[in-house]
Amino acid sequence: MDSHNNIDQSVSELLSDPASVQQSYNSQLRGPEFDQQRQIRNQVSPFNKMTDTIDNDNIPLSSDYDKLYQQFSIPSQQQYENNSDNVYKTNNDLAALASPLNMDLDLAPSDQQQQPQQSQQQFLNDFSNLQPHLNNSQEQVQLNGLTSNILSNPQITVNMPGAYHQNYNCDQMEIDDSPPFTIESDLYFEQQTDNNSIVTSNRVHNQPDVESMFNNQLSVPSLQRTELSPQQHETNVTTGRPQESAFGSFDNNSRVSSFANVNNAGTNLFVNGKDLYFDDESHHRTGRLRNGSIDSYYAANVINHQLHLQQQTQAQAQAHQQQQQQSQQQHSPQDLASHTSLPSKSIYNELSPLTTTTSRASSIQSGQPSFFSAQQYFSRNSMDQVPSSLHRPSFDLYNHRPSIDSQHSQQSQQRNARYTSFTSSISNILPFMSEKNTNHNNRSPPTPPTSTSSPQNLLSSNQSRHLIRSIFKTNPTPIVSDAGNSNGNIVNGGSGTIDAENLPDAPYASGTINDSEFLILSSPTKEEPEDELMQPKKVKKPKRSLFTRFKTPVKQEQPDSEMAVSAPVDELKPDETVIDMVGNISSHHSSGTPSITTGAGGNTLEHSISESSFQEPDYAALFENVGKRKNKSYRKPKGKTKEEEQQQQQLPLSSGTAGGTSSNNSTGTVEKTLFFNKTKIKKEPASERSSLLDNASAGNASASSSEASSIQNAIGSDDHNGPPLTSAPTSSTLANASKRILSSKLISKKKSTSKLKEYTAAELEDMCTVSSLETPVATMISKGIEVEVDLASLDLPPDTKIFPTSIINNKNRTRGRKENKEADLSDTSKIYLCNLCQRRFKRHEHLKRHFRSLHTFEKPYNCDICHKKFSRSDNLNQHLKIHKQEDEKDCADAETGVGMDDASG
């Protein structure tokens, strides 16, 4: 062994980079020589300063490397630089990028320093891996033979650091500056490499294409855990490593490691800032290959394509080679560490010990990481690539377990690999692309695996898919094409809208109504069948007018037997509004209660009566005269005859008994509406007055025959003050509150409208009184003292007529003045009280204006231009401004006319 030690001594002295020596020893096979290799490793460790074996004065210069190459028949450094056509280099500009979770990209030094180091270190590793197995007698012969084999092999040119050589069974991977990224259980590779790959050289299409795939992965897992005995687990733990090799401040690279790496952090070795990690369980070196570096952007798509073309022809040869390697591992400890250097062309689709390529639970869920996916440990910097590469499908832990969706994943992978990589990269941006090659008949939920120890049991079967469509769009409500359920789905047939709450659970032909994937991914694509259920078009709803604003939504919750005989209620149409002769537009079915008008017989009549028993007030009556100025014909309508009054009282009876189809013999025309199954009489100008009373009393109408007599008495009396019947209970308390408020306003409106009565000229003369200067018309209440106010202070003519309150209310002033406001009647802060109408005022001038304008009909203010009279001076002043503007306009027109005449002349 003297010559063996001499060779180690000479190699360690001639190397300027001790990290390559350390890597060469760490990559050796574990076996009976493990203790010897550990001693040699400790001798050449930089932490021991190499004081035991290396004499610093005897280290040669870099110019002596050529002699070393010539001694072992190895080409010089310049020749290997010329042979390497394409070298993948990193970009140091990414070092300034901030990474999440304190994880920085581990970048190599400059390009000029990295390239000689790669070529030098790689061939020294090739040479040093074979040294411990050389005998003293056969040392030089084996060395010359192997070096000549290396020189004759054209595949020895390495394109990328960290690649696998296919001609050697030893681990030839170079370790980068990052710590190993492993999980306690063995982490396997993914079948899809980086989606955002860029092909920069034609060199990638050659033989070592597979080598770049390992740079795109996370780590090289080891499968030696089950092949080593517990005694080897205990004896192989390196306890002699220096403890000062833990993560320290001298390490410029911030690292993130898993649970297994943190436990072994105290025993890690650093050689020139590089981390060499020794896995205590697998007993050979595992290096973390950067997935977040620039190397992950190169040549992944073409590599996938080359692997896809070669995998079918090489499948049998790879399986045979794997069996031979497994048999050799049991007999010779020399081949123990060669298990990780299997031919790596099977990692795309075949089941190998390195790469278990079982697909995920469903090929549709391409945007969702699985349980053992490395993406959940934040392996890459999120700023490097688009989010589609962060959600690639990963693989299962178990070798021989069949995948759940293996048939579809195999079929989809038989296409062009470059197109597969492209479509998977945009499958999360365009969610419908994930359904492109899936069969629609196999959308049932996946069956859980039978093994209880499977990590798939920890996954929930209905995990949420974070798709863009689920944010901006809702799930389309399918329309059932079954004829038996078509009537129950469409609520408003006229408008074409669909009430989604009342839709029954429709049976789907494929049986996937409970499948959560189908509900989210149910939007049809261009390759899906034409007969799939499409989302219904949105029909433009008609504008809701002022009178239908308070209409409650219609809820059709009827059994199927009732649906067969009753038709849904259509919305308001323009031809259903009644236009009176005076221009007053009113709606007569604004309460929202549907009427069931059919001719089915007695059963339908009973249903119609029960439906209309829940009455609501006529809220549209509050807006009866909004926005319309009343003219003289409306202000002084003619009286209503007794015959028309009786006909109006009989209307609810006839509509309740005949289902809204009865008619009368009045002078008006009969129109059938949807308001409480009653008919509306279109009045002629002679019966215009009764139309107002009809709207006032229509809120109390009922189609129930049991309540017809009480309603008849209620409508017949003028002093009817009873509240309307309570409306049906609704689901919203806010709607109930608003209805109560509107009902109270409606009651006050009915009080005022029910008291309207026509007076003749003789009756008005009898009711009014001629005032005198001594007649007290108002009193002032201040501190309990009543002060009388006479007419002399009001500046009224001596023959002024004073009208009572009833006539004032009947007057129907054109402007909205506060005639019966309760606050004016009960506010004690207003001390001036009118004895006629009991209204209070704060100032005496207000009382005078009120009395003169309302109680007297006197208009003392006259316009000198048009001789129009006004009851108030401010109204006269406002009127005079109109005349002033007209005069100014005439003057301006006259001036422009004179100017035009001068110009023409």
Swiss-Prot record:
Skewed-composition ranges (Low complexity): 312-334, 439-460, 647-669, 690-710
Cellular localization per UniProt: Nucleus
KW Ribosomal protein (keyword) present: no
Species whose genome carries this gene: Candida albicans (strain SC5314 / ATCC MYA-2876) (Yeast)
Protein name: Transcriptional regulator MNL1
Domain of life where this protein originates: Eukaryota
Feature: compositional bias, Polar residues: 1-29, 584-598
Annotated zinc fingers (C2H2-type), start-end: 832-855, 861-883
Residue numbers spanned by region Disordered: 1-34, 312-340, 383-419, 434-460, 525-544, 584-613, 625-671, 685-733, 885-905
